[in-house]
Amino acid sequence: MKLQFLFIFIAFCVMLFAQIATAKPVEAEVAQSNLDECEVEAEVAQPKLYQRGEGGNGMEPIPEDVLNEALNA
C-alpha cells in the first residue's frame, strides 16, 4: 500500500513538474503587447461629435470646419 502511494505521489510530482516546465511565459508578453497596442489606438482615436441628419433621420458627424468654428468662437 505504501509503495502504491509512493508511486502515485512520484507520478503526481513528475506531472506537476512537466506542467511548470512547459508553461509558456510568451503568452503573457503577447497579451501585454496587445494591451499596449489597444492603449495606443485609444490615444490616437479622436471622438466625433454627431448631429441629427437631414430630415431628422439618423446621425451624421459634424464637419470639422463647423466644429472648429464653434470651438473658436
UniProtKB/Swiss-Prot annotation:
Secreted keyword on record: yes
Tissue-wise expression: Salivary gland (at protein level).
Role, per record: Acts as a competitive inhibitor of host thrombin.
Transmembrane parts of this sequence: none
Domain of life: Eukaryota
Subcellular compartments: Secreted
Signal peptide: 1-23
Main localization (coarse): secreted
Name of the featured protein: Salivary thrombin inhibitor XC-42
The species this protein was found in: Xenopsylla cheopis
Phylogenetic classification of the source organism: Eukaryota, Metazoa, Ecdysozoa, Arthropoda, Hexapoda
Quaternary state and interactors: Interacts with human F2 (thrombin).
GO cellular component, one term: extracellular region
Keyword annotations of the record: Secreted, Signal
